[in-house]
């Protein structure tokens, strides 16, 4: 057997040659010189197709190529057929083939297949979630970037509404609301709410608009309270249990509307009598009041001021008897609400009326005695006949006589105005109200039917600009809407101008059950203060107010409100059953946005005792009967929301306040795990998180009752994560011995001194126990392994470069470091499915540097 001779020189085969080759091999392993890949397979394929399309076709086809191949002894046609017969699709080996050939390959194939399927599913889910996130973000951004002109006008209106005293006014209303809520929490139903708000409005009634707002509060108070300041709606606060706004078939409750009509009319009558007294006091010489200042003398004095000039009555059509315009006298008695005085006047002067209207005393007496102000049928027929024959068609008749007959007999309801004597807005509305009636009978003829709904339609037909001088005095139209019982429209109209009063009107109406409310909107506006309308039409055509949106918007726009005051404005939602869940949701959002946990949710002292908060003390007002229910509905829900939003520090505190201590520790572990993951990139650890974790664990450890509520595995995981933090901090400070000591206490890595015989067994045992670790610790194992390996490498390099690197102790240490490094590499490859490839590459490089 002959061997080929080697022509290389002899010295090349010596020790220097082998040393040079080994060094070169080590350098290539540590820093492999791989070529730089400029294009991936997809780009290469795309470029190949592009170049193929750019190659010009040969004029003679493939003739030259055929001749060239034939000259080399190749049959081009046969070769082309063989190429076409080849299958270029590589069929993956089937499970059956793998099972008969190689079990290890079979397992590896299935593992890779599962990993790829999982990754593909994860990528698809991530893409779907990202697309949804982009769509939601675009919707919110688009809405903000395209504000409508209505929103701009609405914002300008709100800006105009802040007159002097607006801040003090809103603060005073807020403190009054809080006081009423506290009294209700202690004593139950609060009947003084409307009177308390009315007093605040009186205190700030300094100009025309604020005075009219005060008048509106007095009007609402007259509807709600009786003469003894006791609410007429019982002690439930919900009108569906006392007066139904709408019955099940949608018909309007006549009893409720009649009360609104009567109260509004009486309010206007009392208001007019005050104006009358002021006019008399202002012009006493023209009034010529003589004798006792009785009601009749005051009415006569007002007639002198209004209808008498230089001793002559200005209207020649007035019927004057004994120097008294009797029809004007009776009309203004009715206008001031003195019906009994008018009846007494006609009875005392019956002989005078025999000359002008013989039967009128009977008419007005029957009108006063009728329960609903409707004359008996016989008298009504006589009055209609007299009205049609002597009053309605006569051009020179007394206008006050026309008005009085129209009021008492409800004549000619197709014309409900009397412009010659009711030229002022309040007089016009009063005239409409005194003509309106609410009937329960279905047999009422059409010409006799004129109700509060008809008055409402008349008012709405004019619109707001007609009564407010093109928007310069919006409170006037609000006042008229309140007079007609259109509370929902009134509040919606007032809110852009005077939000504080509008919100408190809404709270009061809802509290006493006067408000028709829409179903819960379930979506909170992203742009507070820019709500165009809060009215929703019901099936019966009546508007309903989105009460929840109103309160939420006010709490978001009013900057003067503290978190507790904001909660006071959300609590009234619970007066309406359908808003209870929205109230709880809004309170949770308030807690997270303000982060005023101590005042809103309370605190837990070091001894485990609770310090109650505002919401806990007022839990009965938000439909929560017990502390346990309160913690579940409010505190725990807020904690879950904070957890979902990634506010982990807030979630920890909220779970702690909700007395779900195990969940608090779970979030702590998650936060620690996330911080450890970021540590490898930033080498910075949040000190506040560490101090919070240690302080809370110290509280739990010192209180057996709290300690028992935390799961053992959670406590163990927290301790292991804190040890990991210590190891990472030690590594940052280049204290590698301490880093390895802390990691050794984890008992995750094979860092303990081992005999070579049991080394493999221990490593495999730790690798099997790996999957039982908590996920927050599990995800940090690659970082833990890398920190341990780098610490060993640094210690190895330090020991090797020391001046005592050749003694026996140093040699033993170096050998121990290499053994630990080898075990770590072995351990890492046993759990390689959880180890990134770059980590494995770094581990191999470290091991090579240590050998």
Swiss-Prot record:
Superkingdom to which the source organism belongs: Eukaryota
Location in or out of the cell: Nucleus envelope
Query: What keywords appear on the UniProt entry?
Result: Meiosis, Nucleus
Q: Name one GO biological process term.
A: protein import into nucleus
Functional summary from the UniProt entry: Has a role in meiosis.
Q: Which family does the entry's similarity section mention? A: Belongs to the nucleoporin interacting component (NIC) family.
What is the protein named?
A: Meiotically up-regulated gene 87 protein
